[in-house]
Amino acid sequence: MTDSTPLDSEFLNQLTATIEKNLANEQFGVSELADALSMSRSNLLRKVKKASNLSVSQLISQVRLKRGMDLLRSGSHNVSEVAHQVGFSSTSYFIKCFREYYGYPPGEVGKRNINQEPIPVAPPPSNNKK
């Protein structure tokens, strides 16, 4: 994250909450987020980049992948169920994005130390294909 102000943090919290409300909607992307926040697309892109140093697509992917990690760590869902719950219509694409972000496939989550906080190894993919 960049040198963010309290306003940036508040904005990012609002964004994250809005994304989480629409998590299962695979069609929820940049335009839908801008509409939900009553902002222009260009203003949203600029503010997100300033507040997080990520693109809007990357931020949406990051929220989806982190929620996916939470669901996998709970142990009550398989990878395919989690992929669909966090807005990926393709399980294989979820696995690809997860592996790029965390450095290991989602099937290994249960085998890893559950007390250790997962550390992303790369920024989330900016391509919002599912």
PLM ranges: what are they?
Residues M1-N25, G110-K130:
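Inter-domain helical "communication" segments and dimerization helices
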Residues K50-S89, K111-K130:
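Terminal helix-turn-helix DNA-binding modules in bacterial transcription factors
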Residues T16-F28, V48, S52, M69-N78, ...:
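Basic, amphipathic alpha-helical hairpins
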Residues V30-L59, A83-E108:
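Basic/polar phosphate-binding segments, predominantly the helix-turn-helix DNA-binding elements
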Residues M1-N13, D35, K50-Q58, Q62:
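Short, Lys/Arg-enriched, Trp-marked, Pro/Gly-tolerant hinge/linker segments that flank
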Residues P6-S9, F28, S42, H77:
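Conserved catalytic/ATP-binding subdomain
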